[in-house]
Amino acid sequence: MKGMFFCARAVVPFMKKSKDGAIVNVGSIAGITGAGSSMPYAVSKSAVHGLTKSLAHALAPEIRVSGVAPGAVATRWWAGREEKMKSMIGSLLLQCIAEPDDVAKLICSLIEQESLTGQIITIDSGQTL
């Protein structure tokens, strides 16, 4: 979370000078649900979501700030736990685990969206519904 804050602080003067910019922070559904791999993880992701909303208020209208909250994503985090990942699929509305490319596409979309700020967008195949 500190890294996100310091990165934003470093880039804001340049974005304000150009009167345009977008920041997209990556949190997690753990920051929304309070459940995750550990309590500190969930709390830190909740802080990321709070930072995102606070920055959106502070930096508008020149800079848009949004967040992405991925659920399960097929990354190396699952190494050694592939069976657990596969067992989750049945409980997901879309019956699939997101790929890193899915998250990247959402981030790119948020950067291009000029009418959106302060929102945390969940990408979790319906896991939190």
UniProtKB/Swiss-Prot annotation:
PROSITE patterns: ADH_SHORT. InterPro entries: NAD(P)-bd_dom_sf (IPR036291), Sc_DH/Rdtase_CS (IPR020904), SDR_fam (IPR002347). Gene3D superfamilies: NAD(P)-binding Rossmann-like Domain (3.40.50.720). CDD domains: SDR_c. GO terms for biological process: fatty acid elongation. This is Short-chain dehydrogenase/reductase homolog YusR. One of its GO terms (molecular function) is oxidoreductase activity, acting on the CH-OH group of donors, NAD or NADP as acceptor. It comes from the Bacteria. Belongs to the short-chain dehydrogenases/reductases (SDR) family. PANTHER family: 3-OXOACYL-[ACYL-CARRIER-PROTEIN] REDUCTASE, CHLOROPLASTIC, SHORT-CHAIN DEHYDROGENASES/REDUCTASES FAMILY MEMBER.
